[in-house]
Amino acid sequence: EIMQTVGQELGLSEEIARNLVSQTALGASQMAKVSDSSPAQLRQQVTSPGGTTERALSTFQQDGLEAIFRRAMTSASQRAEEMSKDFSD
């Protein structure tokens, strides 16, 4: 959703932004599914020095995306445990 919104803010039409986002997600998931490479290896394979992916990854790192993912996943896991207990009572 955020990727599509930003794409539109950068001047893409809604249709093109949606298609780019869905194709990016589909391509990444298919690569991960069929490859024997680790996620880190796949990232290295698609990251051209000085390219757009490298720039985006650098921004993610600088802005603390890893910490955001860790907090979000931990929070969701904790909520799943709470819900499991609620349903088992």
What are these regions (language model features)?
Residues 1-19:
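Anionic-ligand binding region
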Residues 18, 22-89:
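NAD(P)-dependent Rossmann-like dehydrogenase/reductase catalytic/cofactor-binding core
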